[in-house]
């Protein structure tokens, strides 16, 4: 009934991936250290209105990397046995030019991310909650968790007068969605807010690397925020492996700011769809007003495992 017992009994717990059939319910496993909030929208809205909503929504690739780094034996296709950061590089944009720095940068990213997870509001995309529950237990957290898929609606409804900073690779799509009028994409009332945009580089495998490593790129992005956008009220991020270290640094540098990792939900928040990210699962969407993602697939991303982010 706690994190230790949960991990001790991990081998008895059925696990799924995106392609698994539904698993028949057999035995119930209870971990009372980590529980789902039963009042999610109200609690997250209250935090947001107090400018205290900080959450990173770690992705499945990042969760698998953390577990492997911590030597938690979870069967998954999201790392290679002798190359555990392969998917971090191919999917999430983690990079370094000098392989001699590999372990140094692993440790930097893990330390920043764990520091963040221990202090933040933990959210998960429930389709890979199985990774996150194990990761949270391995970090011995004692917290409530939330469904991150409700966060963008909370932001849309409660951002009156706020300055929102988008940090990600798809500035053209997000800006076009905003300029079209976000209210036109949704059939519920949307707040009036203004926008800043900070474009992050595409650094997945096959792309050119702009600096020596992701660490140096993060430092440059943080300096740009300090110089140009420090009066933001809410930051929303969709930038892969850059997310956790950026959020961890921003939460320490800026007090009373909302800093939220939305990933692909950034597109949906602004009424943008692609072939891999349809709008049809949103009952609140005014579908005829949504726009298709504008960005073409970048050079070097021909074999990217998640082409949903581009035309």
PLM segments and residue spans:
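A generic structural motif
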Residues: 83-88, 193-202, 260-266
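N-terminal glycine-rich "phosphate-gripper" loop used for MgATP/nucleotide binding
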Residues: 234-241
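Electropositive, gly/pro-rich neighborhoods at or near active sites that engage anionic ligands
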Residues: 1-194
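C-terminal functional extensions of proteins
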Residues: 242-311
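Glycine-rich phosphate-binding "P-loop"
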Residues: 134-141, 196-223
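A short, acidic, amphipathic alpha-helical segment used as a generic capping/interface helix at domain edges
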Residues: 39-40, 107-109, 216-228, 243-244
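Structural motif
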Residues: 163, 233-234
């Amino acid at each position: 009934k706690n994190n230790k017992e949960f991990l001790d009994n991990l081998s008895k717990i059925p696990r799924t991936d995106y392609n698994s059939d539904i698993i028949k319910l057999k035995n119930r496993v209870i971990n009372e250290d980590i529980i789902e909030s039963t009042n999610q929208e109200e609690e997250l809205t209250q935090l947001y209105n107090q400018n205290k909503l900080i959450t990173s929504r770690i992705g499945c690739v990042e969760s698998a990397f953390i577990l492997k780094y911590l030597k938690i034996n979870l069967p998954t296709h999201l790392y290679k046995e002798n190359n555990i950061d392969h998917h971090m590089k191919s999917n999430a944009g983690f990079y370094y030019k000098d392989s001699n720095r590999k372990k140094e940068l692993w440790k930097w990213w893990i330390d920043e991310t764990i520091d963040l997870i221990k202090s933040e509001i933990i959210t998960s995309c429930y389709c890979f909650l199985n990774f996150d529950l194990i990761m949270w237990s391995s970090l011995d957290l004692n917290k409530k968790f939330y469904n991150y898929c409700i966060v963008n609606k909370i932001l849309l409804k409660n951002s009156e007068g706020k300055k929102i900073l988008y940090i990600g690779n798809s500035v053209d799509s997000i800006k076009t969605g905003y300029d079209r009028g976000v209210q036109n994409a949704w059939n519920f009332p949307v707040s009036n807010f203004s926008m800043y945009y900070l474009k992050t580089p595409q650094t997945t495998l096959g792309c050119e690397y702009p600096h020596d490593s992701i660490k140096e790129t993060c430092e440059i992005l943080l300096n740009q925020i300090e110089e140009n956008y420090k009066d933001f009220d809410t930051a929303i991020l969709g930038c892969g492996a850059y997310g956790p270290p950026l959020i961890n640094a921003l939460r320490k540098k800026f007090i009373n700011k909302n800093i939220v990792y939305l990933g692909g939900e950034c597109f949906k928040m602004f009424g943008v769809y692609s072939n891999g990210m349809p709008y049809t699962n949103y009952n609140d969407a005014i579908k005829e007003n949504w726009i298709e993602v504008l960005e073409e697939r970048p050079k070097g991303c021909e074999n990217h495992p998640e082409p949903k982010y581009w035309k």
